[in-house]
């Protein structure tokens, strides 16, 4: 069982769960499949945390021909409280099982949590700095060349989020 009677990423002793890679895959696909079952056509999906970081990969590769998601934009929030350690080395094979293109997976030859974010950023349309982040994340974002919102220090973040979201939403005349 991936989630029952568990903490988010590690046990009470701080040891990472060995199946975090599978949990992330299950979580990302579960979100998308739930959206499909509810017959929603989202304009925007906002991804938070490492566990959802594979959602952009699945949305843009596995579900890329689904008309329900053809105009969906993805924003990812980056936090500096990322996990140390690695995912299961077999994560690439698990993703290939879903016919995810190898070109999007090569970075996972080194299956770190930072590299999960690299994949997420490369396939996202925007990013929000949800906290003061590490310099290597800033470099990742510069390479991705996507819009950025830095809102971790502003108390009026609701308006900033809404204004940022507006950049990605379709014009409704």
Task: Describe every region a protein language model picked out.
Residues 1-173:
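Catalytic cores of nucleotide-sugar-dependent glycosyltransferases that transfer UDP/GDP/TDP-activated
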């Amino acid at each position: 069982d991936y989630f029952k009677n568990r903490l988010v990423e590690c046990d009470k002793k701080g040891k990472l769960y060995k199946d975090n890679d599978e949990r992330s895959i299950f979580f990302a696909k579960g979100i998308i499949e739930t959206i499909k079952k509810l017959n929603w056509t989202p304009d925007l999906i906002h991804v938070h945390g490492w566990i959802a970081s594979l959602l952009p990969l699945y949305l843009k590769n596995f579900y890329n021909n689904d008309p329900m998601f053809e105009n969906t934009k993805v924003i990812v929030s980056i936090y500096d409280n990322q996990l140390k350690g690695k995912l299961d080395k077999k994560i690439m094979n698990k993703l290939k099982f879903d016919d995810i293109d190898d070109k999007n997976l090569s970075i996972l030859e080194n299956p770190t949590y930072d590299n999960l974010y690299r994949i997420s950023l490369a396939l996202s349309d925007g990013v929000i700095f949800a906290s003061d982040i590490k310099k290597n994340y800033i470099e990742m974002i510069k390479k991705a060349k996507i819009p950025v919102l830095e809102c971790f220090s502003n108390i009026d973040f609701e308006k900033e989020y809404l204004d940022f979201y507006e950049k990605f939403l379709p014009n409704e005349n």
